[in-house]
Amino acid sequence: MTTMAIDNKDKKVLNVPHLRFPEFSGEWVTKSINDLAVVIGGGTPDTTVKSYWDGEIQWFTPSEIGKNKYVDSSLRTITEVGLNNSSAKLLPPNTILLSSRATIGECSLSLRECATNQGFQCLVSKKCNVDFLYYLIQTKKKDLIRKSCGSTFLEISANEVRKIQVSVPSDVEQQKIAELLSLIDERIATQNKIIEDLISS
């Protein structure tokens, strides 16, 4: 999201994007994901125990996220008993569901409380506009893949996600950027819906 700009007066490299809203100035601050969010993994209840499944808790897998900014309903659900008897965690609304396996770096925002399987390192924002963080983490997909490891399949750990470095502006600028990118996403979704309707008609 950010690239280095040059102050022609002092020939100093600044940590700011080349394109920026004119009302903002000053450098962006470098922080780690750990500074901005709590990183939480997931888990899978025992699939042989019927009482763990078909409950009220949405339970996402990596194949269900990344296609849209927001996700609401999952293909499978788990019960509170299943949640408590697994490493799955109950995540609050507006959690960034970040895939840490398979297609590493895919993400969506949850609209409600939910849980995930172990193929995630989810981000619960603590010091950052969650929409801004959603767009920001997508610019770090190459870093996420590069820091992944594994003999059977690539996976990035919670600790490696926490170490990812990002550049962050003020809260007001975060909100402005997030609003613009969200508007663009909405326009794209509207156009895609129009195309789908035309194809199906």
Map each language-model feature to its residues:
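Short coil/turn segments at secondary-structure boundaries
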Residues: 46-54
